Amino acid sequence: MSLSSLISLTTRNNIIGIYNDNEVQIVFLDTPGIHKPKQQLGKEMNNMAYSAAHDVDVAILVVDASKPFGAGDQFIIDHLDIHKTPLIIVFNKIDLARLDKAEELKATYRAIFKKAIFIDTVAKEGFNIDTLIKTVKELLPEGPAYYPTEMVTDKDEIFHIKEIIREKILKQLSEEVPHSIAIYIDNIEWEHKPVQIFASIIVEKESQKGIVIGAGGKRIKEIGSQARKDIEKLLKQHVFIDLQVKVDADWRNEPLSLKTYGYKYEK
């Protein structure tokens, strides 16, 4: 449902993913990672996550088992009120963790969340995801299905087009620049064949503009080419994509810009 990247804090919105089988409908709500914010964007992301945590029947806390417990983990525990909600703690990337270090990490969480259920996973390989689904089923209260069975997410095509473009940028650039990038869809000509997509890549500094474009425009052409392929899979038709890079200074701290780019938390 959301983009994947080795760079942290890439999920910026609450995203619903809908699971259906012959027994149940499970609505998963993927939230931005809770963190100590440096800009208003980070505060908005945290607010989305805090709000979601209060509105769920089961909370799932995903922990990177390959990394030791740190200040960021403690920050999440201190700020996320999930002690009254049935809790599953998922230790993902368990295949990359040393056994003794993984047990040490689990002991830390077990001391804090005494009633939590622990599940090891390797999400990328699908390992133990069936156990996670089974456990969620057992914890959920009975109720009506909220969405049609053919729905897999609450997000529309424009949202996914933006996320595809952003994902390709993340794969092309270093750690610092991607956090200051937003995507704005200027126009989509749906009636045109192929579909015409005009999008702006928003950066905060003039120097970042050149980094995104690359020497002779090589990088932005590659971003556009990779994005086009995935967007065509999404829309199941050919598309033309035009990408422009624009500067919006300090947009991560500007309320109007945050709202324009879809990152303003609304209660």
Question: Each predicted region: which residue ranges?
Answer:
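Switch I (effector-binding) loop of TRAFAC-class P-loop GTPase G-domains
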Residues: 1-24, 70
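Flexible beta-alpha connector loops of hexameric P-loop NTPases
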Residues: 2-5, 34-42
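Conserved nucleotide-binding/hydrolysis micro-motifs of P-loop NTPases
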Residues: 8-10, 32-35, 65-69, 94-97, ...
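Amphipathic alpha-helical transducer elements in NTP-driven molecular machines
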Residues: 9-12, 42, 46, 53, ...
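Conserved, well-folded catalytic cores of nucleic-acid-processing
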Residues: 18-22, 37, 52, 56-59, ...
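Conserved C-terminal guanine-recognition region of P-loop GTPase G domains, centered on the G4
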Residues: 19-25, 29, 44-118, 189-194
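Canonical P-loop GTPase G-domain recognition
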Residues: 85-88, 95-157
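P-loop NTP-binding site
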Residues: 157-267
